[in-house]
């Protein structure tokens, strides 16, 4: 009788282990299928049909960490610290970007974007291109475009100077000055 109880307990344990393994596999498959972002990223085709909004003048505020600054006078100041490749920064932009842009365009806040490059060389190129777009008065649109096409893999080779120039062109930044600035790394310090 003891042998039969032990055998029954072994079978129960075996079934519990099999069920747990299957649960892990099914969970993995579900997250793999449904956890992917349905929006195309890592491709500038996500910018098809994008229209530039009116230019907004910004300055480079070297006293506050070389921030791209939209100074709207003595009102609330918001500092945004970000890296173009940072996935959490993309989440922040997706959640707050339109609100920040409305504060800027309606002159309700001074917003300073500190575009950093803590995730590698591709971040340096994308940050440089962001400053080049700011020189054209089109930082807000370029900033939005960067996060719209952000690759899901950091330092994937996506952020080449050619891709950054094409992104600018795709959204309407077509000046030779922008292209030259991006390709020459003119804003890299």
Predicted segments, located by residue:
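Cysteine-centric redox/oxidoreductase cores and disulfide-bonded domains
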Residues: 117-189
């Amino acid at each position: 009788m003891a042998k039969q109880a032990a055998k029954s307990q072994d079978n129960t344990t075996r079934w519990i282990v099999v069920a747990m393994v299957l649960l892990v596999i099914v969970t993995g498959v579900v997250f793999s299928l449904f956890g992917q972002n349905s929006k195309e990223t890592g491709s500038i085709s996500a910018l098809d049909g994008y229209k530039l909004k009116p230019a907004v003048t910004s300055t480079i505020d070297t006293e506050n960490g070389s921030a791209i600054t939209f100074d709207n006078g003595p009102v609330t100041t918001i500092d945004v610290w970000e890296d173009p490749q940072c996935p959490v920064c993309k989440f922040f932009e997706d959640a707050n970007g339109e609100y920040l842009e409305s504060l800027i365009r309606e002159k309700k806040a001074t917003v300073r974007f500190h575009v950093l490059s803590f995730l590698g060389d591709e971040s340096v190129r994308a940050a440089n291109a962001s400053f080049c777009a700011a020189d054209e008065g089109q930082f807000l649109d370029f900033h939005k475009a960067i996060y719209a096409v952000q690759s899901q893999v950091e330092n994937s080779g996506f952020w080449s100077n050619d891709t950054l120039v094409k992104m600018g062109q795709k959204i309407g930044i077509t000046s030779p000055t922008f292209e030259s600035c991006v390709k020459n790394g003119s804003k890299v310090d």
